[in-house]
Each structure stands twice: as structure tokens, then as C-alpha cells.
Amino acid sequence: MARKKASLDFEQSLADLQALVERLENGELSLEESLAAFEQGIALTRDCQGALAQAEQKVQILLERDGELAAQPFDAEPEA
């Protein structure tokens, strides 16, 4: 259940961030409201970046070697 909760938290943070961006782009907020929305957006961005960093650390590729499964860190760039 913890995995689903973390995923939902990330998804909710991302949705909230998108809504904030739309409100800011709309241009109908006062200066104070815009600053508050911007501050909230920065916090949400940091939360999302942290969640992505944690997920990246957890991602591992399982390789079969000599009949055993060995964990190898995920490499985002394919080998040339």
C-alpha cells in the first residue's frame, strides 16, 4: 500500500502543480496571490523532484548471471 500512496502523492502533487501553472498563466491573480501560488509551486516542484530521485534510486535492472539474479543500477542512457 505504501507504494500506491507514494505514487498517488506524486500524481496529486503533479496535478496541483499543473493547476497552479494554469492559474498563473491565466493572469487573473493579484500580485500577492501570484507570489503565494509561485511559492506553493516551488514547494510542489521540490516534492516531485524528491519523489523522482527516490524512484530513480530504487530502479534496478535484474540480470541473470550464472543462474542467479543480480541487481544492476539503472542506466538511463542506452549504450552506443
From Swiss-Prot:
Subunit structure: Heterooligomer composed of large and small subunits.
Compartment(s) where it occurs, according to its Swiss-Prot or TrEMBL record: Cytoplasm
Protein known as: Exodeoxyribonuclease 7 small subunit
Annotated InterPro entries: Exonuc_VII_S, Exonuc_VII_ssu_sf
HAMAP family: Exonuc_7_S
The EC number(s) this enzyme carries: 3.1.11.6
Catalytic activity reported: Exonucleolytic cleavage in either 5'- to 3'- or 3'- to 5'-direction to yield nucleoside 5'-phosphates
Main localization, broad class: cytoplasm
Molecular function (Gene Ontology), one example: exodeoxyribonuclease VII activity
Gene that this sequence comes from: xseB
Function: Bidirectionally degrades single-stranded DNA into large acid-insoluble oligonucleotides, which are then degraded further into small acid-soluble oligonucleotides.
Keyword terms, alphabetized: Cytoplasm, Exonuclease, Hydrolase, Nuclease
